[in-house]
A protein has these predicted regions:
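Conserved helicase RecA-like core
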Residues: 1-212
Length: 212
């Protein structure tokens, strides 16, 4: 709040939090020149669309930019007028990424063995549920693999601490829900494992994109 009083040039936040602060008059939108919606496909396919549109209603006439690695046709339904797609291209296959499909009767038993076998610098194991992330992380720790669960349900301080340890190499394997699939940059990430198959292709693309 103190930083907002100093009239920053850029304000970054989640839609709900920004709307709450705006309604409290913590900042004004009268001089706003640009409104950016990052991960727009995700925003407009979840309950955040209402908050975003309330903010947009307060800034009529301001240029809006939607950013996303994947496109959701649902975005268009939230705009009164068509918007220009400045960049649109087919999703290209990164030739530096090698993908494998592993069939097993018991993936829980297979995972520790696989992680011990692969030449892993660091890895993210993606799962669909927080309970699975916690369960698998405990399993890997019992198998002498430095790991931690990661979920959007963890409080912010815990998430920041876990990601810091992961970047430093104190954690070798992050067992994560899709909270780690977008907007997180991890250098030297060598492997992404889809322990649970995601519910849509867009999520698969974002997960795999963590390896850059």
């Amino acid at each position: 709040l103190n930083a907002l009083r100093h009239r920053p040039h850029i304000i970054i936040g989640t839609p709900g939090r920004l709307l709450d602060l705006y309604n409290q008059e913590a900042f004004k939108l009268s001089n706003l020149s640009l409104f950016v919606i990052d991960e727009a496909d995700q925003v407009y396919s979840t309950g955040q669309s209402e908050e975003v549109n309330q903010l947009r209603n307060a800034i009529q006439g301001v240029q809006t930019i939607c950013l996303s690695a994947t496109k959701n046709a649902k975005i268009h339904t939230y705009f009164d007028t068509p918007f220009e797609e400045i960049f649109q291209g087919e999703i290209a296959v990164n030739e530096k990424i090698t993908s494998y499909y592993l069939e097993t009767d018991n993936k829980k038993d297979t995972l520790p063995s696989l992680l011990h076998t692969l030449p892993i610098t660091s890895a993210i194991v993606f799962v669909n549920h927080r309970s699975t992330a916690i369960e698998l992380s405990d399993l890997l720790l019992r198998n002498n693999i430095l790991s931690s669960a990661f979920s959007g349900y963890f409080d912010e301080r815990k998430r920041i601490a876990i990601m810091s340890d992961f970047r430093k190499g104190d954690i070798r394997v992050l067992v994560a829900t899709d909270a780690a699939a977008r907007g997180i940059d991890i250098h030297e990430l060598s492997h992404v494992i889809h322990y649970d198959i995601p519910i849509d292709t867009e999520t698969f693309i974002h997960r795999s994109g963590r390896t850059a």
